Every structure is written in C-alpha cells, then in structure tokens.
C-alpha cells in the first residue's frame, strides 16, 4: 500500500464518523520532518517556501506550490496543481475550500503532533476553512503496528532484557572487585551491547546513580558522572530497535523495526533500603494495573483512552501517598520512533483522548521521584487483534531474568546473577 492509499484509507475511516473533507499537509522551508516522513519525502530536500498537499478521502490529491519551487512534490500523486507567488494568490486558491473541514497536524492537547504553524492556521480560518486535529488519523496511519512491526519489537525487547542482565552482571563485577564504577562506564557498556546485537537508538541510555535517579531524564556528563557508592539506587532506562527487519514478505527494510523501551532498578549493595522497597512495590502495582484494566475493558467491549489509563495509574500512586513525587505521564506511544505517533498514556501533561486500539503499542513507566532517589519500572505493551494486552519481550527466557521475573517485581541487588 502506498502512502497515498494508506492516507485515504484512514481518512475514509474518519470521514465515516465525522465531517472530514480531507487531510491537509504542509511544510514551510523544510522544517516539518514529521510531514515529510508521512509523505515519504526526502528529509534533506531544500525548500524555502510553503507547499500544501490536500488529500481527500476519495479522488485526486491537490498540490498547491510556490512558483519558485514547482517541483517539490513531484514524487507524489496528484495532477491537479495550483501555483502562487503572493499571499493574495495563496488566499484565492485556498478560498475554494471555504466551509470544508480539513485535518491538520495540530492538536490543542498534543504538541508532539502539532507541527503546523499558528500563522498558517489563522490564514486557513480567515478563508472560512474549518480545521480539525489529525491526531486520530496519525494514530491510524503511523501509530498502529503491523504484525512485522510487532515481531521486530518483540525481538528488540528480548535483546534489551538480555542487555539489562549483562549490564547488571557488569555492575556486580565491579561491586565485588571494589573497582570504582561511574555512570559513564555503564552507559558505554550498554551502547557496546547495542552495537553487538545490531540495535540502533536515537540517544544514549539513562544511567543514574543515587540522587541522580531523582531526575527522570538525567544526562551522564562526559567526565564520567557519579561513582557508585554502597546503597546507591541505580536506574537503568534503555531503548533501541533493530537496524533492519523483514516485512513478512521477504523484503528487508529499515522502515519495519519498532522500538522497545524498558527500565529496571537496582541497588549497589546486597540489601534494599526499606523505603526503596516500599516505593518500588507501589510502582509495580501501578504498572501491572494497566494490563489488568485493558483486559477487563476488552472483555466487556468498553473502549479505553490513554488519558483514562494514566489517571488510573496516578490514582494508585496518589493513594499510596506519593502523588507529589510524580513527574511525568505513565507512558508514550511507540512505533518506528521511541516516542511514536500513537496513543500516549497521558491524562495530565498532554491529555490524550485517543482510544487504545488493536495494534497500539506504548510504554508503561510509572515513576516516583524524591530528592534522595527516584525510580521507575518500565515495560512495553502492544494490543493484539482481540484487544488484549501483550508485554513485549516477556516470553524471553520463559519470562525470567535470572531469578527475577519479567516484568521486574523486585529491586536488583549485587547478590543477583542475571
């Protein structure tokens, strides 16, 4: 299926339940990589003017192009073309869409998909064009995993669990030998494992010792960071995907791999502090409740949104007395990007009211962050065709990492061999 065919399929699905006349794509001066990705346009193509591509649910797409750059959409279907060189000419062309409803990469609650600039939105509204969010369309187009995507994510997740085990063994070796170990050394070890297993990532993993674990997106400094001390909480957050994968039809492509993203918690010592055990127990309860809630809703045919699941998880943490320790949403959509275009488990930061659908994939990563230390436990879930949740990579090694279960239920110590 071509990108145009897929856009029209999802537009038809949406137009069947709403008054949608088309999906409008636009870019100015090459700024919008999401739009270029969706339309399979080169990311490095040089443009300095605005182009517009309107795809109706059925029929031919329309191109609106600047006279200086008439060929920027030559790779896309659509024989109907309009050209402009002034804003007045652009307005006259757009006026034919007066009273039409067009979807845009814009949403008042989801800045991650809002790539269309406010000035252009105002221009459309001045011409009497009704705009609506393309959030649901984007979810259907890019945020739903195919069978090949899911298998790739499963393989990546299994490798990440193995890497967590190897990394913890590396940490334990330093503990037992009393050789100093800093955060950067652990980070480098993880990146070496990514290379070894032919995985790729968009950023170095989070490795945080002690109080640094209270910063959810802690960055290890180039000088090596903190040296592990007895009793330090260690937070590991790693994400990666395969470099290439099979599309189930014998074609190997970099477009097929889907990310996996997991987080584990350990302590640099042989015993776990009581408060750490208490916090981690709350997090595990909150994390596990997501799959339970999805299963119960699916069995009753009740739709669930990402916002509902996030608020459900938050209520568990708040009830345990740690509401003020929450710093982020419960999870994010996952596809070919680690922060993908599908539904996020978010009812607070950027409320996501899109439904959990078959093929949806997302992280579940509740966190509790104090000034003394922080922690989060993270798994990935995808939804099968019956609406049931599956934990990616759980089948790795029969759901075991040493004596620990997948998902993690107890904090690691240096007595563990994984």
Regions found by a protein language model. Name each.
Residues 1-418:
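Active-site neighborhoods and metal-handling regions in enzymes and metal-associated proteins
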């Amino acid at each position: 299926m071509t990108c145009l065919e897929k856009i029209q399929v999802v537009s038809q699905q949406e137009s069947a339940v709403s008054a949608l006349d088309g999906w409008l794509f636009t870019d100015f001066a090459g700024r919008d990589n999401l739009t270029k990705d969706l339309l399979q346009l080169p990311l490095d193509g040089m443009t300095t003017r605005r182009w517009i591509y309107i795809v109706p649910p059925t029929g031919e797409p329309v191109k609106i192009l600047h006279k200086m750059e008439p060929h920027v959409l030559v790779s896309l279907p659509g024989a109907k073309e309009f050209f402009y060189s002034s804003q007045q000419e652009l307005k006259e062309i757009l006026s034919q869409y007066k009273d039409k409803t067009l979807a845009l990469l814009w949403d008042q609650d989801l800045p991650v998909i809002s790539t269309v600039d406010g000035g252009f939105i105002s221009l459309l509204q001045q011409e009497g064009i009704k705009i609506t969010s393309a959030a649901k369309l984007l979810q259907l187009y890019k945020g739903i995993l195919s069978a090949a995507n899911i298998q790739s994510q499963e393989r990546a997740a299994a490798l990440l669990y193995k890497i967590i085990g190897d990394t913890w063994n590396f940490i334990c070796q330093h503990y037992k030998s009393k050789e100093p170990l800093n955060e950067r050394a652990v980070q480098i070890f993880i990146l070496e494992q990514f290379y070894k297993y032919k995985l790729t990532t968009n950023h170095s993993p989070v490795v945080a010792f002690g109080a640094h674990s209270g910063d959810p997106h802690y960055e290890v400094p180039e000088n090596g960071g903190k040296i592990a001390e007895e009793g330090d909480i260690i937070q590991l957050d790693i994400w990666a995907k395969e470099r290439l994968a099979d599309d189930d039809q014998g074609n190997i492509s970099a477009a097929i791999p889907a990310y996996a993203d997991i987080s584990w918690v350990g302590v640099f010592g042989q015993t776990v502090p009581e408060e750490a055990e208490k916090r981690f127990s709350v997090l595990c309860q909150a994390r596990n409740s997501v799959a339970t809630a999805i299963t119960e809703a699916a069995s009753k045919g009740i739709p669930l949104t990402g916002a509902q699941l996030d608020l459900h998880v938050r209520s568990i943490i708040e009830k345990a007395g740690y509401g003020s320790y929450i710093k982020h949403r419960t999870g994010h959509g996952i596809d070919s990007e680690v922060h993908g275009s599908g539904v996020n488990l978010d009812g607070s930061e950027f409320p996501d009211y899109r439904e959990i659908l078959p093929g949806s994939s997302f992280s579940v990563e509740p966190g509790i962050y104090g000034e003394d230390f922080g922690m989060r436990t993270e798994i990935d879930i995808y939804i099968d065709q019956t609406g049931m949740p599956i934990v990616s990579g759980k089948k790795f090694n029969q759901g075991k990492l040493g004596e620990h279960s997948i998902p993690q239920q107890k904090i690691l110590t240096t007595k563990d061999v994984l």
